[in-house]
Amino acid sequence: MAVKAKTFEYAVEVDRGGRMTIPGGAQIAPAEGWTPDHLLLAALVRCSIESFTFHARRLGHEVAAAGEAQGTVTKRETDGRYAFVGIDVRIDAQLTPRADDLTDLLAKAERDCFIGATLNLKPEYEWHVS
């Protein structure tokens, strides 16, 4: 018998003024200069941190983390469409207690970020964990 996978559903509303609302929840208005491209990079950083934190806590660690991302958009050679052709993500995190081997934890954090897994290109990660 096949096991049914968990399903996560999300919704957001964007009004004519650009304000984003979670139905029945909070509203945010991006500051001047924020584009959908910036929001995608921010979502990738947040998702990467959340994924890392989830797996670290399962192993008994407390986490404090911050991050940044840079992306390059240009015309792809494959189809002539403008798209992200490179994304670099840097995450700085502290684990308490410290971990001896981070290999599996970092692999799971990258693998289980839904935003990164959805992209057509694989982000390049740089992790700094102490």
State what each model feature region is.
Residues M1-V45, E50-S130:
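Extended beta-strand/beta-hairpin segments
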